[in-house]
Amino acid sequence: MISKTEITRDWLPRYTGTQIEEFGKYILLTNFSNYVSKFAERFGCKIKGKGCPLQTSTNDSGLSIINFGMGSANAATIMDLLTACNPKGVLFLGKCGGLKQSAEIGRYILPIAAIRGEGTSNDYLPPEVPALPSFKLHKFVSDTLLE
């Protein structure tokens, strides 16, 4: 029987057009294609997977960005597939609801928790348990934003 590892090592390159060894050790996930374009432009790197369901770009410092599309099912799929390259950290860049009137366009928002109402994650934790970020990753991003 084929293992989950074999499946992820086959599917990650197929869905992204990017070989496993081309992914960086740190991953940014987004559901906006223009974020991938801006990343590639900023770091002078190529966009891969333009004809695939998921597009990626990796800079020389070992940071990759992946446009995984929309929805919790796609988010769960890309997280499963990323086990093939075993990243040290994954951070989602996206939308944030429930913001105060004082928030301005262009400000960075670093959420401390998320309400899990999509249903998919109920397989992992009860619905009343919020989704919490990795403390180390959250602290790193917070410190970086404060610099």
Positions of the model-derived regions?
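Metabolite-binding pocket within alpha/beta catalytic cores that recognizes anionic/polar moieties
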Residues: 1-140, 144
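Short catalytic/ligand-gating loop segments at beta-alpha or beta-beta junctions
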Residues: 147
